[in-house]
């Protein structure tokens, strides 16, 4: 709904999106928007280019990865495994690849908090980016792209099996502050 709303509200004909997320959210379109929201936006023409930064290889189905392979001009990813596990590409080069891919049009910035290690979310991960990695990501996105929105997804500071965790709110505040500073710097 965000991508469609930006297009319609701003009179655009497709935007780019960069997403820091272990999941591509490009699962088959089987009805409900769960794990397939970006595929709906792409199929409907609202999403022209899509880059995923920090994709976890084992969290994505084959058909989604195959779609990226078949549509390299519009779809790109850099994996968490290549960056942090195998160290085949540096963090900065992987991020630069995604940023370069998304330049040239209005761009949405997405952050799924389940990309960050041990943050209380519905799909909490013991193996993810550190908060500083995501803060750098959002800062570079805000300062280098023609940003049209920021969406922070999946925060769940209160889960049925957990006590209230105010660290999630603090982390989100850091992310928003870094983003605002970067966009402000980019406008100058």
Tell me what each language-model feature is:
Residues 1-188:
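Conserved alpha-helical scaffold segments that buttress catalytic/binding sites
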């Amino acid at each position: 709904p965000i991508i469609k709303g930006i297009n319609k509200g701003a009179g655009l004909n497709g935007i780019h999106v960069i997403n820091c997320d272990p999941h591509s959210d490009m699962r088959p379109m089987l009805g409900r928007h769960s794990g397939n929201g970006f595929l709906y936006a792409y199929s409907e023409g609202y999403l022209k280019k899509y880059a995923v930064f920090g994709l976890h290889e084992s969290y994505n189905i084959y058909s989604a990865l195959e779609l990226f392979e078949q549509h390299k001009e519009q779809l790109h990813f850099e994996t968490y495994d290549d960056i942090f596990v195998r160290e085949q590409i540096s963090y900065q080069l992987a991020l630069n690849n995604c940023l370069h891919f998304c330049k040239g049009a209005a761009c949405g910035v997405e952050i799924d908090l389940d990309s960050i290690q041990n943050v209380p979310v519905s799909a909490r991960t013991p193996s993810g980016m550190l908060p500083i990695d995501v803060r750098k990501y959002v800062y570079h996105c805000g300062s280098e792209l023609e940003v049209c929105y920021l969406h922070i997804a999946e925060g769940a500071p209160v889960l049925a099996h957990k006590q209230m965790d105010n660290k999630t709110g603090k982390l989100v505040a850091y992310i928003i502050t870094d983003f605002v500073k970067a966009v402000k710097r980019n406008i100058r």
